[in-house]
Design a protein with these regions (language model features):
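Short, low-complexity S/T/E/D/G/P-rich linear segments that nucleate or cap local secondary structure
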Residues: 2-6
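Amide-forming acyltransferase catalytic core, primarily the GNAT-like/NAT-type
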Residues: 8-11, 15-69, 204
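Conserved donor-binding loop and adjoining core beta-sheet/short helix segment
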Residues: 37, 47-119, 232-260
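Conserved GNAT-fold acetyl-CoA-binding loop/helix
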Residues: 46-49, 200-215
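Short, glycine/charge-rich beta-strand/loop segments that flank catalytic centers
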Residues: 110-127, 138-142
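A structural signal for short, well-ordered beta-strand segments and their strand-loop junctions
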Residues: 110-116, 144, 176-181, 230
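Acyltransferase donor/substrate-recognition loop-hinge adjacent to the catalytic core
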Residues: 130-204
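Accessory, usually C-terminal, subdomains that scaffold auxiliary metal cofactors
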Residues: 209-279
Length: 279
């Protein structure tokens, strides 16, 4: 979402407040309670609002946050583009948006918000009609499933996944699923390193960045509030996954890694984790 112009009438009011600055600060592990006090009560389901993702990817986006008039607000850099997220909270959304637009103006940047969903678009159009342009990018869309679907895999659409799981069970009847605990972090790191070697992570910017975020998350697993699980075959790790709640009714699965030589490992770790995600 971008503003069409920096000259629309609301700036007459904003200019009167131009000496005020939003107190943005870097997102750190110490900010977990503050940030989740807003996100857990929200209806927003964007994976960008996961505290783990905010911290783990800060190296790439320089993510900052602030609390403004009962709203949680974020700003970050997507390459050379300064961007904001839709404010999270309750109250006068229009006033907070004006403050963000003014913040962008002081940065000599066009106001841009990323991660805006269709329901948020309706809110923006109602608050500031005709002032924004909207561009859809499905490459950044989140996939949302019902937990009951992934934990039961009933129906024709999950037939392929059931087949993978059945083959896994038949081939490895003595497999074990265990939660990720501090003493098991290293074996997750070892599998990730092997996966990256096979997939040449360090030769690709995208997978290289993902690796850096994943390693940070594993090293700060408990501080981030993560939950995860591991699959073992013959006492050897073959898959792991982890994530955390995004809000009061949505859980974000942030990572799934598996040994590609073990058929069905990806499907199995997804199924087992779906059956154990905390309520």
């Amino acid at each position: 979402v971008k503003t069409k112009s920096l000259d629309f009438p609301l700036y007459k009011e904003l200019n009167a407040k131009s000496n005020l600055m939003i107190p943005f600060k870097d997102v750190t592990l110490a900010d977990r309670d503050t940030i989740t006090s807003f996100t857990m009560k929200s209806d927003r389901r964007n994976c960008d609002l996961s505290f783990s993702n905010l911290c783990s990817w800060r190296f790439l986006y320089d993510t900052q946050f602030a609390v403004v008039d009962n709203f949680l607000v974020f700003k970050f850099w997507a390459g050379e583009q300064l961007a904001y997220m839709m404010p999270v909270g309750t109250g006068d959304l229009k006033a907070v948006l004006w403050e963000l637009i003014e913040d962008a103006r002081k940065e000599n940047q066009h106001f841009c918000m990323l991660g805006v969903c269709s329901n948020m678009r309706a809110d923006l159009e109602a608050i500031l009609p005709g002032q924004f342009t909207f561009t859809e990018d499905r490459d950044y869309a989140d996939y949302i499933y019902l937990r009951s679907d992934l934990s039961t895999l009933k129906g024709k659409k999950f037939q392929a996944k059931r087949n993978h799981i059945n083959r896994f069970r038949n081939t490895y009847p003595d497999y074990e699923y265990t939660p990720i605990t501090p003493d098991r972090i290293q074996e997750c790191l070892d599998l990730e390193a092997e996966w990256c070697k096979v997939n040449h992570c360090d030769q690709q910017e995208g997978t290289g960045n993902e690796r850096r975020a994943l390693i940070y998350a594993l090293h700060n697993f408990d501080a981030l509030g993560l939950t995860g699980g591991i699959l073992h075959v013959n006492s050897k790790i073959v898959a792991f996954t982890f994530g955390m709640p995004i809000n009061h009714e949505t859980f974000g699965v942030h990572v799934e890694k598996a040994d590609t030589n073990i058929e069905g490992a990806y499907a199995m770790i997804n199924y087992e984790f779906a059956n154990r995600i905390p309520e």
